[in-house]
Structures are given as C-alpha cells and as structure tokens.
C-alpha cells in the first residue's frame, strides 16, 4: 500500500485490483517486470499511462529513510526464510559455491543487502529502468480487442481445438521414432550414491497451554534461526455466512487487514514492514486464519499488531469498496479457469445446491454485490471470539 503502484493505480485511479513489480537477475542479464491485472472493460492505454505516472512519482519523490528501513527489514526476514530447511540450505550453499566461488558468501550476501543506500536504489533506477527499451504485452478478452494498448502488434498464438474424446487416439510414441535419447554431457558425477543408514526421525516436542480468555496454545521450539512463525485459527469461516450473503467471511478477513482504529491501511502495513514481519489473514470454509512470520527480536511487537487487528478493526469504507472490486474480479477470473470450474461443479454434485459447501469459497458475484459494511460488522461481532481460537 505504500508503493507508488498501489497509490496511483489501485488507490487513486482505481484501475485494477492488483499491481506488482519484480526483478529477476541472471548470470549475464536481468529482467525487471511490471504487471497489472486491470478491472473489467479497462483500456490498457489507461493502465500504461498510470504505470508511467507511477514511475514519474517514484523519480520525483525518491526513496525515504523509512522506505529503505522497512524494505531492508523484510529482506532480512526473507533471507533467513530462504535457508530455513535442509533443502534450501543445500540449494543456497551450492548456489554461492557455483557463482561466488565460496559457499561462505552467504554472510557477505546478507551484509551487502543491508548496506544498500537510497543513492544505490536511484542509481539502479536511472541506469536500468528509466527510458529503457521494454516489451509490453497486452492480454485482453478475445471479444474486446479495443482494450489493447495502442500501436501494439498482434502476436500469433495457435489456438488448440479441443475435441471431446480425441484423447483416446493419442499415441505416446508419436514423433519419437528413430530419436534415441542422448544424455547431456556433464563433468559432475550424477551416479546414484550407495544406500546409507536410514536417518533417525526425531519428532519435535510440542508444548501446550491456554490463555485466560480461552485461547488454546500449541508450540514447537527451534533455535537454529532467529525466526518465529505463528498461526491463529478462529473456527467458523464461510460456514457461518448468512445463506444469501456468501463471501461475508472472506470480506471480513480482507477488511481486518485494512487498518485499525488508530492506523490507516498504509500505516498498519508500514508498522508491520518496519518490523520485517508479515501478517496474512484469510477465510476458508470452516475458519478465519491469521498467519505470521517475524524476526524473534520483533515477535512481541508483531503480536501487539495482531492484537490490535483483532480488537480494533477500522472498517474503512474505501478499503471495503476496493476489497469488493477485487473479489468480483477474482470471481470473474475463475470463469476462465477449467480446474476451478470443475472443482466448483464437483462440490455442487457432492453436496447439493443448498449446502454451504456447494458455494464457491468467497461467494458468487450476486452474493458479494449484496454484502454491506453492516454485514461485515455483524459477522465480526458474532463470530470472532477467543473461545473458538487456536494459536500455533
């Protein structure tokens, strides 16, 4: 919410439910990508103009000390998460050995990340992003070519004709005649190692407790990394939605993440980011859950924010409208996803049309359109309670 994309494209112009930017670095060159999923019937010319305005805003305002602090905090947490399993440790050590010539470069890498300055950020922007060549891809419904960005060239895409029953005629050997498999040459020994002794499985000890308000606690301690992960489950979820307003629990979860009485959505996000923490709230069929990740030194401050979210919801009207728009866009997207369509159809056959489990998670377009802020408050007051909460 503090990014130039969110402020300009989503909050100010309200052209899209989501926007993101991502950098992918390779050995010789990198790729900086900006992606926006527009609202229905939105011209991609407007999206392009909004992206350019976002970049202009970034160039004019630069990077603040607070921005750099919260991004570094998040990078530090992400770095520790990237070596939190045996597999990820092996992968990272191998990566550093291959590209830096030293598996111990892991300590230098995190030091380099934490030493980045505001000047470094703007230098990279001016050198690699500003006024650079770019490939711009427009993807629109086939029936709405007028939404494509001006001066675009149509890319030829072969559309596969799906014929029911044709798969029975498919020959797995087609095209493989007289093409022996040739292994790629390598200097590494990839032969299967001899089978060693089976490792002993050490089951971590789970401790349990409970709070005076009735919340049950479960935990496992691991001191290898300075990280804490937590999960709070509140029983209920979509099963407790009014029958004609399915999707209420989902929107409640969305709004719980949109500020508190004393913090705007942007201020809450900044408070979380400055700790290098993450807090995610979601609704399922049978529960609403809050999951989080934090540096151990910032756990208490992170849990204070979770408590504030649970006890002092903001009920921001603007955030409510954005959440509804985003939910409706998501429901529309599902219509183009065969797997989701099949899953929803299966649930209707299994449970029957009137059963709560037959309704897609998050509701339908009609039910979401009918939900009001009062509905969210009523659900929250009736169902968010420590007596039905479990903390892991």
Label the model's feature ranges.
Residues 7-115, 134-140, 146-153, 218-220, ...:
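M16 family metallopeptidases and their MPP-like homologs
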């Amino acid at each position: 919410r503090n990014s130039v994309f969110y402020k300009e494209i989503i909050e100010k112009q309200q052209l899209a439910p989501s926007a993101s930017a991502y950098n992918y670095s390779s050995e010789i060159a990198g790729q900086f990508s900006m992606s926006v999923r527009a609202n229905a019937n939105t011209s991609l010319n407007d999206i392009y103009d909004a992206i350019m305005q976002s970049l202009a805003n970034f160039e004019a305002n630069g990077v603040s000390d607070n921005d750099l602090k919260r991004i570094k905090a998040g990078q530090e947490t992400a770095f520790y998460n990237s070596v939190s399993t045996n597999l990820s440790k092996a992968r990272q050590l191998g990566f550093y050995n291959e590209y830096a010539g030293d598996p111990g470069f892991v300590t230098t890498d995190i030091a380099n990340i934490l030493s980045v300055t505001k000047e470094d950020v703007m230098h990279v922007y001016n050198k690699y992003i500003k006024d650079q060549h770019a490939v711009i891809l427009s993807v629109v419904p086939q029936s709405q070519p007028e939404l494509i960005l001006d001066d675009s060239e149509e890319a030829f895409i072969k559309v596969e004709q799906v014929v029911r029953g044709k798969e029975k005629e498919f020959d797995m050997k087609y095209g493989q005649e007289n093409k022996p498999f040739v292994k790629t040459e390598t200097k590494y020994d990839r032969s299967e190692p001899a089978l060693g002794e089976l490792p002993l499985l050490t089951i971590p000890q789970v401790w349990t407790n409970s709070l005076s308000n009735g919340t049950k606690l479960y935990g496992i301690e691991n001191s290898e990394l300075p990280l804490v992960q937590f999960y709070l489950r509140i029983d209920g979820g979509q099963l407790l939605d009014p029958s004609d307003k399915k999707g209420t629990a989902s929107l409640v979860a969305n709004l719980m993440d949109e500020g508190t009485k004393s913090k705007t959505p942007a201020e809450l996000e900044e408070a979380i980011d400055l700790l290098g923490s993450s807090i995610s709230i979601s609704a399922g069929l049978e529960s609403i859950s809050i999951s989080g990740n934090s540096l151990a030194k910032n756990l208490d401050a992170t849990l204070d924010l979770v408590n504030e979210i649970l006890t002092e919801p903001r009920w921001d009207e603007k955030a409510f409208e954005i959440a509804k728009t985003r939910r409706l866009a998501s429901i529309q997207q599902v219509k183009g996803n065969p797997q989701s369509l099949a899953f929803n159809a299966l649930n209707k056959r299994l449970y029957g049309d009137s059963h709560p489990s037959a309704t897609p998670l998050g509701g339908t377009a009609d039910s979401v359109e009918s939900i009001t802020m009062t509905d969210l408050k009523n659900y929250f007051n009736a169902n968010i309670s420590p007596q039905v909460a479990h903390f892991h």
